[in-house]
């Protein structure tokens, strides 16, 4: 019997990418589906959604409306992920042609969902921490691995605890076996995922080997054949000295750290319920620079959070100047349902929010230009992962710079030393030495 065709579109974060991989694995290995990039030939169309900001939620309904217009007769449409978790039945009301809704904590029910009319699985208490997922990887050379699910922080702007539930650590033996399996299949790098990865080990569903995130990094680095370990996202509150020292000293841990700032104002951080101050953040970031001079630090920043004054915003710019981030992901505050910040007084005018975002991004561009210029004539070890146009190939350095050289498919999955000859903001161009 010929395979049915599966089309999947993934929006949002790396955790969504891994969730999509899990669903693809379940469907291709257990339900006789094969992936297709042509939506018109698909028997099953999935969209894995994000709800961190308002824009992706609006995009969901425009996308599924487009799916309905082009899908073939009899094809099913499923809405999955975080937006599915918090909108639930509203999706059926606004898009009655959707066949099932599957929240982020319920992806293991995908085979049940495709067989049940108007199936809705949005229980954020459903436990997938020990679910034995079938295996699928979008990349041969890099493997995403969940080490925890959910979040307990309840930051006042964030909807994630309402869509992914409370935080539970995945047992070490499951993580270790998944990493081993990925390496055996050709992966050179594993990418550990969680809402707060460095809070790992605080709570398991059942009794398991006790360890913290630093211990986990050390244990995983013993896997033979594993070259690199990356992770996202750590929480600044849990960046103790032990964690920073393991990060700096373990040669398999990539020297790229994502440190979500959100705001440089201690008052705004308190209103956000982030649990740390500007001083704590700077202490940790500068300690990291001291321990690991070649580290690349990225961050998330929200401007125009309710009540943010010009002085508060200037505090954020001050942190930007002091830490000199290699990369920032910056956004205007987006009001999200079910969050405390949505009903806070002193919501910021859109014009002010846009101006602050522009100011922040322009200042970072100036900083970044100086950072990338310093990379010229340096030599980096690069893992090549992606073919580019014009007989070029791209990969990443240990500290996460994107590097492009002339090269062919035979370099995919290989490490090569590259000397940088021309550094741009988004790409470092170089030559293999």
From Swiss-Prot:
Its main location: cytoplasm. Binds 2 [4Fe-4S] clusters. One cluster is coordinated with 3 cysteines and an exchangeable S-adenosyl-L-methionine. The keyword Acyltransferase does not apply. Its EC number is 2.8.4.3. GO terms for molecular function: 4 iron, 4 sulfur cluster binding; metal ion binding; N6-isopentenyladenosine methylthiotransferase activity. It comes from the Bacteria. Coiled coil: none annotated. PROSITE patterns: MTTASE_N (PS51449), MTTASE_RADICAL (PS01278), RADICAL_SAM (PS51918), TRAM (PS50926). SUPFAM superfamilies: Radical SAM enzymes (SSF102114). It catalyses: N(6)-dimethylallyladenosine(37) in tRNA + (sulfur carrier)-SH + AH2 + 2 S-adenosyl-L-methionine = 2-methylsulfanyl-N(6)-dimethylallyladenosine(37) in tRNA + (sulfur carrier)-H + 5'-deoxyadenosine + L-methionine + A + S-adenosyl-L-homocysteine + 2 H(+). Keywords: 4Fe-4S, Cytoplasm, Iron, Iron-sulfur, Metal-binding, S-adenosyl-L-methionine, Transferase, tRNA processing. One of its GO terms (cellular component) is cytosol. Pfam families: Radical_SAM, TRAM, UPF0004. Its cofactor is [4Fe-4S] cluster. Residues 137-370 form the Radical SAM core domain. It is found in: Cytoplasm. Residues 4-119 form the MTTase N-terminal domain. InterPro entries: Elp3/MiaA/NifB-like_rSAM (IPR006638), Methylthiotransferase (IPR005839), Methylthiotransferase_CS (IPR020612), Methylthiotransferase_N (IPR013848), Methylthiotransferase_N_sf (IPR038135), MiaB_methiolase (IPR006463), rSAM (IPR007197), rSAM_horseshoe (IPR023404). Monomer. NCBIfam families: miaB-methiolase, MiaB/RimO family radical SAM methylthiotransferase. HAMAP family: tRNA_metthiotr_MiaB. This is tRNA-2-methylthio-N(6)-dimethylallyladenosine synthase.
């Amino acid at each position: 019997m010929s395979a049915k065709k599966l089309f999947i579109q993934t929006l949002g974060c790396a955790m969504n990418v891994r969730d999509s991989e899990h669903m693809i694995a379940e469907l291709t290995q257990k339900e006789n589906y094969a992936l297709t990039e042509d939506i018109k030939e698909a028997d099953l169309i999935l969209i894995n959604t994000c709800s961190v900001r308002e824009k992706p939620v609006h995009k969901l309904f425009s996308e599924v409306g487009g799916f309905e217009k082009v899908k073939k007769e009899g094809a099913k449409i499923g809405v999955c992920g975080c937006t599915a978790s918090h909108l639930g039945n509203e999706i059926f009301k606004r898009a009655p042609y959707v066949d099932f809704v599957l929240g982020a904590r319920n992806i293991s029910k995908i085979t049940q969902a495709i067989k049940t009319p108007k199936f809705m699985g949005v229980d954020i208490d459903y436990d997938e921490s020990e679910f034995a997922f079938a295996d699928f990887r979008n990349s041969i050379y890099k493997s995403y691995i969940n080490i925890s699910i959910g979040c307990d922080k309840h930051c006042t702007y964030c909807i994630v605890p309402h869509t992914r539930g409370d935080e539970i650590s995945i047992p070490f033996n499951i993580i270790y076996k998944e990493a081993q399996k990925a390496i055996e299949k050709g992966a050179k790098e594993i990418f550990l995922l969680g809402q707060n990865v460095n809070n790992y080990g605080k709570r398991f569903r059942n009794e398991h080997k006790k360890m913290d995130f630093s211990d986990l990094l050390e244990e995983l680095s013993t896997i033979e054949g594993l070259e690199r370990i990356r992770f996202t996202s750590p929480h600044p509150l849990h960046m103790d000295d032990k964690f920073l020292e393991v990060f700096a000293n373990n040669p398999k841990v990539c020297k790229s750290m994502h440190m979500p700032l959100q705001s440089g104002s201690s008052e705004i951080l308190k209103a956000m319920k982030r649990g740390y101050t500007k001083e704590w953040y700077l202490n940790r970031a500068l300690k990291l620079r001291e321990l690991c001079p070649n580290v690349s630090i990225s961050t998330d920043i929200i401007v125009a959070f309710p009540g943010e004054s010009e002085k508060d915003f200037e505090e954020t710019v001050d942190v930007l100047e002091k830490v000199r981030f290699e990369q920032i992901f910056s956004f205007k505050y987006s009001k999200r349902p079910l969050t405390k910040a949505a009903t806070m007084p002193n919501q910021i005018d859109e014009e002010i929010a846009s101006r602050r975002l522009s100011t922040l991004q322009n200042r970072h561009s100036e900083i970044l230009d100086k950072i990338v210029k310093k990379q010229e004539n340096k030599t980096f070890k690069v893992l090549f992962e992606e073919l580019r146009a014009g007989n070029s190939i791209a990969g990443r350095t240990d500290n996460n710079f994107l590097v492009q050289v002339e090269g062919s498919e035979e370099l995919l999955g290989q490490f090569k030393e590259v000397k940088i000859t021309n550094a741009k903001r988004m790409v470092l161009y170089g030559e293999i030495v």
